Amino acid sequence: MAAINNDWLEALQGEFKKPYYKKLFETVNEEYRTRQLFPPADDIFNAFHLTPLHKVKVVILGQDPYHNVGQAHGLCFSVKKGVDIPPSLVNIYKELHDDLGCTIPNHGCLTKWAEQGVLMLNTVLTVRAHQANSHRGIGWEEFTDAAIMALNSQDRPIVFILWGAPAQRKASMLNNPNHLILKAPHPSPLSAYRGFFGSKPFSKTNKFLEAGGVEPIDWQIDL
C-alpha cells in the first residue's frame, strides 16, 4: 500500500500503531498477493493524497470501492477516464446540471474536485473483485472514522455531504458548529427519486463556503 505522506500522516499516525490497523494491513497485503482487489494497491489512499487535510473544504462520503475491473481509483463515486460512468454518478451529474447548469462530461473522473478540496472518501478503502462489501468489518471503518474525527476538529468551514443511510450514520460524529451537514438519499437509481434529485447540494455547498470567506468549488468537470 502506498504510504500517506502529507499532513494526513500527522493526523492519522496514531492509528497506524494500533493493533486493529496492524491486522488490517496484514489482511489487505495478503489478499493483494492472493486475490484480485480494487482499487490498485497504489491508489488505496488516493483521497488523502489528492486532498491534504489542510485543504479540505468539502467531504463526500461513500461506502466501499467499485468492484469491477478498471473502475476504482481511490475516490468515492469516481472512475477512471475511459470507463463507463456508473449509474450513481450519472445521477450525480444530472443533479449537478439541474443545480448549477454544469455541462455533463463524457467521463467519470472526479480528480478535479479532489484537487480543489473535495475529500471523496469511502468508509471502506478496498474490496474483492466482484464482491461488494467484501472488506466491510476488517478494520477500514475504524481508520476512516479517525479521519472523520480529525475533520470534525478543524474549525474552518467544511461541508459534509452525506448521501444515503450508511453515510448519514456518521453524522453522530460531527458536532462542530463551524461545519455544514447536508443529507439526502443516495444517488443510486434505487433511491435518487426519493429526494436526491432537487436537493441542490452543490449550490448549497458553495453558498456556505462563500459565506465563510472560502473560495467555492468549481464543480464543472472538464469535458
What are these regions (language model features)?
Residues 2, 14-162, 166-169, 174, ...:
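A polyanion-binding, active-site-adjacent surface
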Residues 196:
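C-terminal substrate-binding/active-site "lid" region of AdoMet-derived donor-dependent transferases
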Residues 199-200:
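Polytopic transmembrane helical bundles with strong interfacial aromatic enrichment
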